[in-house]
Amino acid sequence: MDVVNSTARAAVTSATAVTAVTGTGDRHPNPLSSAVAAASDVANAHGSSSWLGLFARVVLWLLQFVSMVLYYAIKLATISVPTLLYTLFSTSLTVTMNATTLMLIVAAMIGAISWVVRYRYLNMYSRLPPEPQRKEPDVDLFPDTHEEGIKSGLSNYFDEFLSAIKIFGYLERPVFHELTRSMQTRKLIAGESFNLEEEKGFCLVVDGLVEIFVKSSSYNRRYPHGPYFSPNSEAPSSDDEHPAPGQQRYQLLTEVRNGAPMSSLFSIMSLFTEDVPLRHADEDNSEPGTTTHSGLFPNYPASADFRKSRVRMDSVPNTPQMDASASSSANNLPGQLDRGLPHVPPISLDGTGFSKPQRPVPKRSNTTSAHPDIIARATVDTTVAIIPASAFRRLIKIYPKATAHIVHVILSRFQRVTLATAYNYLGLTNEVLQIERQMLKYTTQQLPNHLRGDALDRLKEKFKREVERMGEEDDVSKGIALHNARAGRRRRSTATLRKEAALQAFSKQRNISSMSGSSLAIPNAGDLVTHLQQSRGGGNRAQSVAFTDGPSPHLDVEREAVSPLAQRTFDPFVTPRSIHVALEKRETLDEDNLFRESILECMFRSIGLTGSGGSNKDADSNQASPRLISFDQRRQKALYTNHAFGFMDGLDGSADGDTESITSAGLSLPASPNPQFLAQEMRDEMEIVFFPKGSVLVEQGERNPGLYYVVDGFLDICTQEDAAASDVVHPTSRTSLHAMDSAQSIRSPQRSPQPFAESMRSGNKVDDAEIKSKPNRRSVALIKPGGLAGYVGTISSYRSFIEVVAKTDVYVGFLPLTSIERIVDRYPIVLLTMAKRLTNLLPRLILHIDFALEWLQVNAGQVIFHEGDESEAIYIVLNGRLRLVEDRKDGGMNVKAEYGQGESIGELEVLTETSRSGTLHAIRDTELVKFPRTLFNSLAQEHPNITIKISKIIASRMRALIDDPSTMLGIKDSSGRSSINKSSTTLNLRTVAVLPVSAGVPVVEFSNRLLSALTEVGAPNGATSLNSAAVLNHLGKHAFNRMGKLKLSQYLADLEEKYGLVIYVADTNVNAPWTQTCVAQADCVLMVGLADGSPEIGEYERFMLGMKSTARKILVLLHQERYSNSGLTRKWLKNRVWINGGHFHVQMTYSPNAVPIHPPAKPSGPTLRERVQILQAEIQKYTSRKVRHSPFYSPDAPFKGDFHRLARRLCGKSVGLVLGGGGARGIAQIGIIRAMQEAGIPIDIVGGTSIGAFIGALYARHADFVPIVNAAKKFSGRMASMWRFALDLTYPSASYTTGHEFNRGIFKAFGNTQIEDFWLDYYCNTTNISKSRAEFHTSGYAWWYVRASMSLAGLLLPLCDEGSMLLDGGYVDNLTVSHMKSLGSDVIFAVDVGALDDNTPQAFGDSLSGMWAFFNRWNPFSSVANPPTLAEIQARLAYVSSVDALERAKTLPGCIYMRPPIEEYGTLDFGKFMEIYGVGYKYGQEFLAKLRERGGVLPIGEEMGGKKGLRRTMAPRRASI
């Protein structure tokens, strides 16, 4: 305590001193001194023993410490510091320093500042956040676990039966019950055989295994003509002997397993068309008492052959007897027919009949079996179900509408399965063309004689004047159509207006007939037309409305009262004074209409429409009944059609778009109409067209535009003889692009024939015009006047196997496909007639192939075969998509190939009898043709020439592998995995789904623009778009329920068969059935998102992932402006590992507000407007005329748009630009790009090497020429600076420079932009010297991989990327054309600017002195070539593989090789920027001009924009007469 007291006293003393200092001159007491005094008093009063005293002392100590601090602070500020400053400033200092020391100090300061700037400011590129390359994701596989041949669920009879009757298409419940209620089953023990010729019905295997055999070599020895025998020849009956199948008499065709039909497509057509006549007799020959077998068919003369055929069919055992009345009615024919007396037709001027008597068509064989020469043997105990023929006959009578639909489905599949396979795959050209040739005898109907004299001459004179008036610039070969003033009004009318017009016409005819009894004839010049009408109606009086025979003056009054466009109300019995009368304009129009009506009548009779049904009173009343006509118009809505504008049929029906059942019409289906009435109704749709000699009316491989009736002249049915051979020997680039990882993975090059497709992909070595001007055609048949061209292809809506060419100047009547399809919908007898004719004309070889081929329908994810399975069949894709995968050793899967429509799988394995090289599964629901190995073996033994076609196919695959080994070796990405060849995944796409990422994306507007771009680009066979409204309008409100599922699938399959590309627009809610349909039907899914929106995963993406779709998925980002911010694309791709098809940037203006994905329901106005726009776009393909005397391309060509770029990608027509390396010589590439842009050539994909990678990246970033010039010029200026090069030198341990200046120059051009943000697809290649391979980079920082691709060894350091060292890509491949081809590019512009090799011969001996070589280099008088230096040897060694790759690139199909004259410029001549740029620009202009002049293939050519459809449709150039 003494210490504390002493301390306190000292503190008091110091505080007193402070108080004295601070309190001087202040009268008021100091608060600090007062506090200290008070604390001291308290401490003294209480002492140290109490707590209060202790606290007071602590406070006293704190106050004393504060006072001491204040004291010293005030002293330092007021006394010490001023004193020190005064002393410092008053002192004199002298520093002595020499210049060396000063320079060293300044140098140190400059070095420090330079270090800060160099490593803290100028190398910002090295401090960018790491963004590694995006790995190409593996394709998700969700294969079905069901084994082949085992059905899901309970494998019972019902499942197997339903699987077998899928071949009939969609069957409603009543139709299904009617077809199966008389079905019988038959048990077969193992080894039991039975003759299918005795089975008059549809047979299918419910349980077990059956082998199908056909008569073999003994038949060929008896009939030595082999497969080329006449189909009408007599065949021996098989009733006399039934040898065992193991003998030589029979060959094994195929094996039929559970759920597969034993009957063929031909058998089904035979069962449905038993009672259909081959040729419908004219009305003049019809007897009033003839009857028909069913309500579907009109009265036709039943011959004795048909009656006997019916007797034989009705006497078949196990056939129900409920058709006794029908058979008895067939037998109770007039006696004179039974006696075979000749029938004398009445005298008439009607010339529609044949001028010479037609001999009856001989029967194919003595039996009417639907299974000729076929027997079956059960391998195991088997259950067979049989639907008798009587069930089919009963179905025709009860449900004729459903029957027509089934026949349509069967006929379509027969064309797609049997005929297409025989023609394209087996090379049976003669057999298929024989059908076309022999069909002419059924489709010939002559015009009336009075239309062949002066009337025909006047018609020719009109066309002659028009041809003379046309200029040389007009292409007459496209055809000149006769002007029809009513055609425009007809096109603008709807189905409802047509119905009202028809009713009005019928009512007027009845009114006239009631007033014409007491009339007088007032002849005038127009009576010629009425005379012709009288001639035409001479044989149709029984079917016409009852007119009186007296002349009528009311006719002329009516003619004056109404418009000339309504000239349907005239008296057909007014006779003219003279036929040689000068016709006025209106009468000329009437004569033209008369020609149209007469041609239509001949057409209708040729296709099976006759007026014989008019003799029936009920039929007459039906024709005149407005209620029934309206009902019939509505009835056609429920039929399946292949309309070009099939989705518009909803406007013809009810307002809600619903349709009635197929079976609702029942027995009310009217008989065949009167051809005259139908011709009057449709005459405005008929065109009379003139084609000069040599014009092509129908091209081989295209869909028939319609029916051509020859009025005068000759048409030649021919085939391109070497078309198939060229496809086999010289496969197109599309074929060579398939991803084949091994020789076992092959595919067929035989697709649907596409004329001139080869020339579009043959590079600049093929003259397209020369190919078109000199086709190698082989004539098949000649169509004379009265004949019909395009009958089979038009009625069946399938591609044409033939080519129709004008043999002479020809005048034809043309009825478009849409009109034909409407007729087929309303009158099913047209389909049945053609089916009957086909069954009568088919050669036996085609029939046997039809029995062996199997039509399969597999579900999405279902496995067709597994890796290592036995190769028992070849598969051909009808529609859908398949993927072949193989297992990797690490447990993953590699995609080997994808197969689309028309491609085949497994030929090599079947021929070599090896096991499958991979697992094949369906990406989506797919239809296949199964070509069994047993059929191939049978054909090889019986007809060895058939196997030549398949042998050529396999040889072409092997040749493609040899010519382009990269397709077999695959492409390695940066991780070393085998990436998926994109060409195989974008090749032959048939369906594309447009799916929004989330609600609010304008997918409807996007799909409309995409469809327009596809139309202009020229998608093969056209493109169409489907949304939910279109499907509901066409199929009704039950389209998406269980009942309509098969109906919807059949409708979608027909659309895929008809169009080259179908776009499914998911414009409904995320859980709607239509959204599920879009995803399930897609070969490729376009995920459309708004670039400015949130990159989070949307609800539609979750829905798609939940469906486990294995289709290709492409991300499409919509931008308001043509620019993408850096890093934006990476944010979208980061969470979407399932995007395995790349991404696209598309500029499309849209409202920033949320756009409802499914707008609320509105009246039919908007829907009608959308459909009218689509209709106009379709018509524009055929009516638009190209502007003459203009270049192929213009700078503002719309083909450079983003939608056109996406359309070319989907169609496999992408244009690639490959830029090679060459240092400063690469500046010439900028000039070539400018020339291409001015020529209007679009560029979709850019790839480059070295300096080409730099130029290509600049162009891909902006997709424009202007921005790249400035950036490239700045970079060239930096590279030309010697000071920068000198400052960048370093000790040459790894390179001569540090690479900083080089990096800085590239970074200033690109910044932190990533390759994903480039507007165009881009890649650059490098050489990975760590792993000794080439690598291609499509993601990551652009400057980084461009720098790596430009890293010249020795001059620059290699770049380290994920542990690997990357150098210049030119060491391996300086012109990456093969990789560009693998990305799916169709046409490739390759610009080579590399240095030329010095091939000077060397002879410096076995040893060489370095001193001699040095002096020899500087000796101007030496005649010995200078030996290469060490650096030159190393450089040549490095580029050895690149030279070989360059030579392969020059000869690659589809590659247009360009090399500007830049040999005089060096690698580092960057200072000559403008000079080199000018050389490239001038060369590009000259090269493209020469290419265009000599007809070289450019990416926008004549085949785009729908020009092919201009020549043969309703819109050839009209004659203004």
UniProtKB/Swiss-Prot annotation:
Gene3D superfamilies: Cytosolic phospholipase A2 catalytic domain, Jelly Rolls. Residues 316-334, 738-753 have a biased composition (Polar residues). Residues 72-96 are lumenal. The gene is NTE1. The lineage of its organism: Eukaryota, Fungi, Dikarya, Ascomycota, Pezizomycotina. Residues 1-50, 118-1521 are cytoplasmic. This is Lysophospholipase NTE1. Coiled coil: none annotated. Residues 1217-1381 form the PNPLA domain. A motif (GXSXG) lies at residues 1248-1252. It is found in: Endoplasmic reticulum membrane. A nucleoside 3',5'-cyclic phosphate 2 binds at residues 837-957. The chain crosses the membrane at residues 51-71, 97-117. Intracellular phospholipase B that catalyzes the double deacylation of phosphatidylcholine (PC) to glycerophosphocholine (GroPCho). Plays an important role in membrane lipid homeostasis. Responsible for the rapid PC turnover in response to inositol, elevated temperatures, or when choline is present in the growth medium. One of its GO terms (molecular function) is lysophospholipase activity. Its EC number is 3.1.1.5. The active site is at S1250, D1368. Inhibited by organophosphorus esters. A motif (DGA/G) lies at residues 1368-1370.
